[in-house]
């Protein structure tokens, strides 16, 4: 006797009628007929669809157990796979034995009933929302997306590097970082100047949750040539919107001996590979999102895969935006950072294709980006996708120590805090480039979901860390 996931049964793994199998899962619905037969719809999360189980009244525990099953009860069923005569699926289980592992104590108050719930409500019961079709589908797509990224990187010769989550420096040069401390908040030590004495803290200095694994990744790229980081990052940005999370996952490839053009080509190749993997490996889930969330997502992904990326300079992008007939909420001028409305116009309307925008003004970009020969711009790029805007941001890194020191000084950053990062430029420095890809932002693009909190298992945002 073997245990089969529902996905395998529905794919058509047929066994002889007298060969019993075991199916484990949770009850979605129960329907009873006057003929003394009950029909259970059960799911186990292995696929979108539920499996129908036919239970005859002659089972010993039919009256004591089966007729009391409600949504959410967990069961183990032994039976035979048979061809279904009903509409909707090809196979079902003829039960020979059913064991109830867990009852729903109060079906009247069980939050995840068979009816459809709003996504807002489901966020309030985040520990139970994986039991719904929509969050189950999100989770399977997210898994396949992560696997496709790892697979692509492996094929391309990249090594995965696990970078630290606790750091003592600021990669982006911004102030929105979570502090990590073991100091007694009710009895803080102070210096003679009245400042918190972090020498008494666990690490002997200020420590934070990382905003990026990039700087650490550069260290390994300058030894292994091609690496990537893949893990959680944190931003203490007090922004309570559908586009922001305090904790999110980033993929950050870093390539030695590569310039901006090289990394733009890599970004295009990676995106097309993983989108194609999703369309092939998660057919049912993607069709579900197309039916329930956004009917255009399959066409959008297919067009993305078949498109030739447009590539323009930032200055050219500003010219296009200033001369178009579109009215924007934010005035367009050289030196500004592009807003979502500008990115969407370029990708959706002007080019009607993915766009790579390069060479941004240095004053709006991070200190580690390589200064161009004009002294005003840096070798940075953003990949803009139709329907969403920016999905990748990257750059060629500044490999010249003197230039890097000047950039740190211009940003008011203490160069001693970055001593080891600067040290990389003193021993066999090489041109190198990389980019960052937010996993949750990519999930929104793939699934059509509207709120970023619905594509991560337990979202963290201002005043929300309950689960």
Curated annotation (Swiss-Prot):
It is found in: Cytoplasm. Disulfide bonds: none annotated. Its main location: cytoplasm. It catalyses: tRNA(Asn) + L-asparagine + ATP = L-asparaginyl-tRNA(Asn) + AMP + diphosphate + H(+). InterPro entries: Aa-tRNA-synt_II (IPR004364), aa-tRNA-synth_II (IPR006195), aa-tRNA-synth_II/BPL/LPL (IPR045864), Asn-tRNA-ligase (IPR004522), Asp/Asn-tRNA-synth_IIb (IPR002312), NA-bd_OB-fold (IPR012340), NA-bd_OB_tRNA (IPR004365). It is an enzyme of class 6 (ligase). One of its GO terms (biological process) is asparaginyl-tRNA aminoacylation. It comes from the Bacteria. Keywords: Aminoacyl-tRNA synthetase, ATP-binding, Cytoplasm, Ligase, Nucleotide-binding, Protein biosynthesis. Signal peptide: none annotated. Its EC number is 6.1.1.22. GO terms for cellular component: cytoplasm. One of its GO terms (molecular function) is asparagine-tRNA ligase activity. Belongs to the class-II aminoacyl-tRNA synthetase family. Homodimer. NCBIfam families: asnS, PRK03932.1. This is Asparagine--tRNA ligase. It comes from Baumannia cicadellinicola subsp. Homalodisca coagulata. The lineage of its organism: Bacteria, Pseudomonadati, Pseudomonadota, Gammaproteobacteria, Candidatus Palibaumannia. The gene is asnS.
């Amino acid at each position: 006797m073997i245990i089969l996931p529902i996905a395998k049964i529905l794919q058509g793994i047929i066994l002889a009628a007298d060969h019993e199998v075991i199916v484990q899962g949770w009850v979605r619905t129960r329907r009873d007929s006057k003929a003394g037969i009950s029909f259970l719809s059960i799911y186990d999360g292995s696929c979108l669809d539920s499996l129908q189980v036919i239970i005859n009244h002659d089972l010993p525990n039919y009256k004591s157990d089966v007729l009391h099953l409600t949504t959410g009860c967990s069961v183990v069923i032994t039976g035979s796979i048979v061809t279904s005569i009903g509409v909707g699926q090809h196979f079902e289980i003829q039960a020979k034995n059913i064991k109830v592992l867990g009852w729903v104590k109060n079906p009247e108050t069980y939050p995840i009933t068979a009816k459809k719930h709003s996504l807002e409500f489901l966020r309030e019961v985040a520990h139970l929302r994986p039991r719904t079709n929509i969050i189950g589908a999100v989770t399977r797509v997210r898994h396949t997306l992560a696997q496709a990224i790892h697979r692509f990187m492996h094929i391309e010769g990249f090594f995965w590097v696990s970078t630290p989550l606790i750091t003592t420096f600021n990669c982006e040069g911004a102030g929105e970082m979570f502090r990590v401390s073991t100091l007694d908040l009710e009895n803080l030590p102070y210096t003679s100047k009245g400042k918190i004495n972090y020498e008494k803290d666990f690490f002997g200095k200020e420590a934070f949750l990382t905003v990026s694994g990039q700087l650490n990744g550069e260290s390994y790229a300058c030894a292994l040539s091609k690496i990537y980081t893949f893990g959680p990052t944190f931003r203490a940005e007090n922004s309570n919107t559908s586009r922001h999370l305090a904790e999110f996952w980033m993929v950050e490839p870093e390539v030695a001996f590569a310039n901006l053009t090289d990394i733009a080509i890599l970004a295009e190749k990676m995106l097309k590979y993983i989108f194609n993997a999703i369309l092939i490996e998660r057919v049912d889930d993607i069709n579900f999102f197309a039916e329930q969330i956004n009917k255009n997502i399959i066409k959008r992904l297919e067009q993305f895969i078949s498109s030739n990326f447009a590539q323009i300079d930032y200055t050219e992008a500003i010219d296009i935006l200033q001369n178009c007939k579109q009215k924007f909420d934010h005035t367009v001028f050289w030196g500004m950072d592009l807003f979502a409305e500008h990115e969407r116009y370029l990708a959706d309307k002007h080019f009607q294709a993915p766009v790579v925008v390069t060479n941004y003004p240095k004053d709006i970009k991070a200190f580690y980006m390589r200064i161009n020969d004009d002294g005003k711009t840096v070798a940075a790029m953003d990949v803009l996708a139709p329907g969403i805007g920016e999905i990748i941001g990257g750059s060629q890194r500044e490999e010249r120590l003197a230039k890097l020191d000047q950039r740190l000084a211009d940003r008011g950053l203490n160069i001693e805090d970055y001593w080891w990062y600067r040290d990389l430029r003193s021993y066999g420095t090489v041109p190198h480039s990389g980019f960052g890809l937010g996993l949750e932002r990519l999930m929104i693009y793939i699934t059509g979901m509207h709120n970023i909190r619905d594509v991560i298992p337990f979202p963290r945002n201002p005043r929300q860390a309950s689960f």
